[in-house]
């Protein structure tokens, strides 16, 4: 039994270690176990500046379906330099800058989401500042048509939402008789932007243009998470009905080995980062091609190409698309497009994590505070597992009663393992003890623990949520300060300390292993785990502390009441 309990602790410890390593690799940090080439390359100023994004070739339908990750020929480079204007549109949720040079989205600021630890700064998604490049580009291919390198003229109109429910920005560009009109519609309370593309054929011959939508990003991770999640994963994603949700790393694009769907009748493209996402969603039931490619050093694109059919002389063809750029709030994601909620990554235990998040949302609607929500959720989970855990604690209490007899057997048959094991089994049979019965509560909680970890890791709803002294439940508890030791960042809070104390009490309530080495290992566990929990989100540690307190109360009740206090021995 003692060996099995120790093995279980090792399994639990290894699970936490693998969870930590998985988080490191998820956020682009070096793995503890594996050597890997990081996808965060050193930024090259020439590549991430205006020239690289502006002179990058537009995609072509003929080549993107055959190759992914390679530069594709398109409109000629070296377009004449034209003075442009960045037009700023302000709504109740965001401030967005659209450049008349190319009609591209160059800046997008979320007015309701602040940088973690600095409420004076809003989260910025689209931007180009010399260190990061993040752009949204659209245009036409198939001929010398307007694209993201063409000059557009803005139609006069309001630039702020004010008291209206929507505001529009209309941009026009004509090249060799083909006019492209982009109409951006911004609505109150929405992170979705409707973008209508009208192609007017003012030539004397029919044309067959295709519309491309692409998101451009450098290979470095952006912020937007808490200090614990400072280098959260950033990368392209493609969704189709046939192939579902597919993540693509910048590293695979760099090596020309990106694997993803190439064609489809529906779906979308996105750039995913921690807590936030930007995406282009074309109309459903429209044939399209998908591509990823390297534009320049440390600069990549993910996009889609949609044929607009034949446009006769004097005729107009239109295509409505949607751009979403905002937080990964579940309700908003579900309303954007089929499968779009998958950008919120709950890891490999999604089947457990989603119900946990749903339950959290229901509780939060009643309580209105995420800290108290986590506490109530913990109580609910504990009640759900009460019958099973109670049986386990009874088994552990009985084990504590027979610990002296087990010690006597070990002493009597020292050096005779076969006789010792036989005597142990006879003791278990006589006392009606299940030697692994005490393991069940922990085994059951491990998947729930991991699932809740991913819920707290992925849920922007909890970001910057406060509870008592904690200002951000998605970041480590820093009540006693944050310290930098070289490149090492340590935060010290009361929750990990309470975690260690609760684990120590639990250890004292459990049967003491007869083996002195095992006993020392068990006593060392609270210290080891408390150090690890200094780096975990406060919300997760809060859950585990409350869970431990409830477990202690339950185990004490069983020891003192159900066994008549005999388990004290």
From Swiss-Prot:
Transmembrane segments: 7-24, 219-239, 299-319, 340-360, 366-386, 436-456, 485-505, 526-546
Signal peptide: none
InterPro entries registered for this protein in UniProt: Membr_insert_YidC, Membr_insert_YidC_N, YidC/ALB3/OXA1/COX18, YidC/Oxa/ALB_C, YidC_ALB_C, YidC_periplasmic_sf
Molecular function (Gene Ontology), one example: membrane insertase activity
One GO cellular component term noted in the UniProt record for this chain: plasma membrane
A Pfam family this chain is assigned to: YidC_periplas
Domain of life the protein comes from: Bacteria
UniProt subcellular location: Cell inner membrane
Keywords: Cell inner membrane, Cell membrane, Chaperone, Membrane, Protein transport, Transmembrane, Transmembrane helix, Transport
Keyword match Cell membrane: yes
Subunit structure: Interacts with the Sec translocase complex via SecD. Specifically interacts with transmembrane segments of nascent integral membrane proteins during membrane integration.
HAMAP family found in the cross-reference section: YidC_type1
Similarity-based family: Belongs to the OXA1/ALB3/YidC family. Type 1 subfamily.
Name of the protein: Membrane protein insertase YidC
Gene this protein is translated from: yidC
């Amino acid at each position: 039994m003692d060996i099995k309990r120790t093995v279980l602790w090792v399994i639990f410890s290894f699970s936490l270690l693998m969870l930590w390593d998985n988080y490191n690799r998820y956020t682009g940090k070096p793995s503890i176990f594996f050597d890997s080439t990081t996808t965060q390359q050193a930024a090259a100023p020439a590549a991430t500046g205006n020239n690289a994004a502006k002179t990058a070739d537009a995609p072509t339908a003929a080549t993107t379906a055959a190759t992914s990750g390679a530069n594709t020929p398109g409109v000629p480079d070296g377009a004449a330099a034209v003075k442009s204007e960045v037009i700023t549109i302000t709504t109740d949720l965001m401030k967005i800058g659209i450049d008349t040079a190319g009609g591209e989205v160059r800046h997008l600021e979320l007015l309701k989401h602040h940088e973690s630890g600095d409420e004076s700064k809003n989260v910025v998604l689209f931007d180009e500042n010399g260190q990061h490049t993040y752009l949204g580009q659209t245009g036409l291919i198939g001929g010398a048509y307007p694209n993201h390198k063409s000059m557009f003229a803005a139609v006069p109109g309001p630039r702020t939402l004010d008291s209206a429910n929507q505001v529009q920005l209309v941009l026009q560009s004509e090249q060799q008789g083909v006019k492209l009109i982009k109409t951006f519609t911004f609505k109150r309370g929405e992170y979705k932007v409707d973008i209508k593309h009208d192609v007017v054929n003012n030539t004397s011959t029919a044309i067959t243009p295709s519309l491309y939508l692409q998101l451009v990003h450098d290979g470095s991770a952006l912020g937007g998470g808490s200090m614990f999640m400072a280098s959260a994963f950033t990368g392209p994603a493609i969704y189709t009905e046939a192939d579902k949700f597919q993540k693509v790393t910048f590293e695979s694009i760099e090596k020309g080995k990106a694997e993803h769907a190439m064609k489809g009748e529906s779906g979308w493209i996105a750039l995913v980062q921690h807590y936030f996402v930007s995406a282009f969603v074309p109309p459903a039931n429209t044939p399209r091609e998908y591509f990823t490619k390297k534009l320049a050093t440390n600069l990549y694109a993910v996009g889609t190409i949609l044929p607009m059919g034949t446009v006769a002389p004097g005729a107009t063809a239109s295509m409505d698309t949607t751009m979403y750029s905002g937080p990964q709030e579940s309700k908003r994601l579900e309303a954007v497009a089929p499968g779009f909620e998958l950008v919120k990554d709950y890891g490999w235990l999604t089947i457990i994590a989603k119900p946990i998040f749903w339950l959290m949302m229901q509780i939060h609607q009643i309580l209105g505070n995420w800290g108290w929500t986590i506490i109530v959720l913990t109580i609910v989970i504990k009640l759900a597992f009460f019958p099973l855990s109670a049986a386990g604690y009874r088994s552990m209490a009985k084990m504590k009663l027979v610990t002296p007899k087990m010690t006597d057997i070990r002493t009597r048959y020292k050096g005779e393992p076969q006789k010792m094991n036989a005597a142990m089994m006879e003791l278990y049979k006589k006392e009606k003890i299940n030697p692994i019965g005490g393991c069940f509560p922990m085994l059951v909680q491990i998947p729930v623990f991991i699932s809740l970890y991913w819920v707290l890791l992925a849920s922007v709803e909890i970001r910057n949520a406060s509870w008592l002294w904690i200002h951000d439940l998605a970041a480590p508890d820093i009540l006693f300060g944050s310290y930098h030791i070289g490149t090492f960042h340590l935060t010290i809070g009361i929750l990990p300390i309470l975690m260690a104390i609760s684990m120590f009490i639990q250890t004292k309530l459990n049967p003491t292993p007869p083996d002195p080495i095992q006993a020392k290992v068990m006593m060392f566990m609270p210290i080891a785990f408390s150090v690890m929990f200094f780096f975990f989100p406060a919300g997760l540690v809060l859950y585990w502390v409350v869970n431990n307190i409830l477990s202690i109360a339950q185990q004490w009740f069983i020891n003192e009441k159900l066994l008549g206090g005999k388990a004290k021995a």
